[in-house]
Amino acid sequence: MFTSLSPYRIVVTGRIKHFISAFGEHVIAKEVEEALAQAISKAGGEVSEFTVAPQVNPASGELPYHEWFIEFEKLPEDIETFANTLDQGLQAQNSYYKDLIEGKILQRLKITCVPKGTFVEYMKSQGKFGGQNKVQHLSNDRKIADNLKW
């Protein structure tokens, strides 16, 4: 959106943080969207909204991982197949992510299914409800993840 014509000034809005790199993996939105499309194609389901956050220090001492919070309009036929396909799709597109998985720095992603309306309620709680406001899909921290309520 233009905010000034003299001098020219444009404000970029929307999803401007299109990456996650908490572990040096540099995963970008395009890779996430393509892997998600592959998972839906193979396992079925319809995704309403999602966000991905790193779990850097899991409580049980396990390896860190990416946690996907997904609101499904329709659940996949097999959530495990969905998760495997999603992870394999990311590894196929992003060699850094693949190296971290194979090197046992990260474990495979984990999916947390959230009820319908979770992201709408989150956006309302942030004062960002409306057509021009979008859920951030990728984050290097857990600010969104830790504020989701269900």
Q: Model segments located where?
A:
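AMP-binding adenylation
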Residues: 1-150
